[in-house]
Amino acid sequence: EAVEAYKKALAVKPDYAEAYSNMGVTLQQQGKLEEAIEAYNKALAIQPNNATASHVVSALTGLTTNTAPRAYVENLFDGYAKQFDESLVKRLEYRIPKIISDLAQNLHGTGSMGSILDLGCGTGLLGLEIKEYCSNLEGIDLSYQMLEQARKNNVYDNLNHIDIVEHLSESELDFDYFMSTDVFIYVGELSDVFRLIKTRNKRSGRLIFSTEHTELNGFHLEQSGRYSHSKSYIESLCSKFDYSMFHFSTAPLRKD
């Protein structure tokens, strides 16, 4: 058993933070949450900057942070990149890119959708759905390995390995649409995203995105390590940054 193997490794090297962290992952998968928290905390005692342990402890203990650590997101998706499409599309019946693409086309009507920025493009699943309807398609993502998979699809005019807020803060923005599928669930606090698009984009663009829905107020870090967002939270951002909400709906997006 994996847990026993980690314990043996720790008996030889008690300050092996990675073993504690990996043991936490295994215990969490087994549903032994209290033991998982204990293992993660031991990893943090040795390695305080352990992004995975820090984020998961927050998630399992009900502490909502503003955003997931960059290193956590990068490590998660770099490790997941090669099997991402197979796992999501075929096994989990992942529908978000198709839903977002269909919604965008319905809102836009006839003619080209112009220039689109795919925020957190991953392997390019949204790009495959939307490319034929726009004149320019760019993508950004934190995971280098996910971007390598996206390049193989050959649908993006430009791809950048960069954080969303960093890109929105520093790059020239001239887009008709900003789209994001299953990405804000790792961002949490969305104020900067809404503000930067509103204040820095050269044209009047639209933002189309998915979140995991919660009936609670605000946004919350769930035990899954993902953030959920309420409709009232999104409405408050629209009001604060002068957006108009054209559409809101809930739907089953994938098996879990």
Feature-to-residue mapping (PLM):
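A short glycine-rich, Lys/Arg-flanked "PGG" loop and its adjoining helix->strand segment in the class I
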Residues: 191-206
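Class I SAM-dependent methyltransferase SAM/SAH-binding core
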Residues: 117, 123-167
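A conserved beta-strand element that flanks and buttresses the S-adenosyl-L-methionine
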Residues: 179
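Conserved alpha-helical positions within TPR/SEL1-like repeat arrays
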Residues: 18-28, 55
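Short, glycine-/aromatic-enriched active-site segment of Class I SAM-dependent methyltransferases
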Residues: 209-227
